C-alpha cells in the first residue's frame, strides 16, 4: 500500500499547485515521512482494518475475523473523530479503507478508491457467516457503495470489477520511481525480500547459513526482523549483503537479476515492470496471494512449483 501511496502523493504534488495533502495512517507513516519530509501533513491514526498473521506468516483466520468485528464496533467513533478534525476536505482518496467513504458521505466530499482488492471481497473469502445474515459483510458493502469512483488496478478479481462496473475505471500498475543502477557482470545478484508481513522470515533465517557456499551469487537480504546472531552471520559473509528497511528493499529490485518474495501485489507489479525473473511464495489461507498467483498462471507467465 505504501508504494501506491508514495507514487500517488508524488503525482499530486507535481501536477496540482497549492494542494495540501494529509495522510491518515499508522504503521507506515515513518516510511512516508522519510520520503516527503514536511511537504505533506501526517495524522497518526490506525485505520482499523488489517490481516492478522501467525508466526509463520500465514493468515490467522480467527484473529482476522475478530479484527473485522472490532472494525464494525469501532468505525462509528473513527468517523466521528475524523469529521471533527476534517470537516471540509476537498477530496478523499483511499487505498481501500471502507469507512473512508462513509466519512466522505458525511462531509459531502468526492471520494476515490484505488486498489486491486476490497475488504468485502476478502471477508467473503475468509470469514463470511453462511448460516445467517452477516452484519460485517453488510456494513462493508454499504461502505464501499458510498465511494464515488473505483480506480481498478491489474490483477483485480472479476467479482470486484463486476460489482462496481458503473463506477470503475481500469488503470495501469502504480509503482515507485526507481533510480538508475549500473550492475556488475561479475556475479548474479539475488534479492530475498522479507516483506512487511514477514511471511518469509522463518525460511530466510534457515537459509542464511547456507548462502555463503553459493559463491557466484550476491544475496541481498532484508534484516529488520532478525536477531543479532543472524545479523552477525550476514556481516561476516562475503556474498550476503543486508538491506535495512522495506523502502530500501524495494529500491534494490532494479539491481537484482533474480527475486525471491511473497506473492504480494506490489512485488509482482515491480518485477513485471522491471522484467525481473522471480520465485513467488504463496501464503497459507490467504485468498489475495492465491488469487495473484492464479491470475499470473492464467496469463501464462508463471509455472507452479509444489
Which ranges hold each PLM region?
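Conserved nucleotide-sugar phosphate-binding/catalytic loop shared by glycosyltransferases and other
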Residues: 14-72
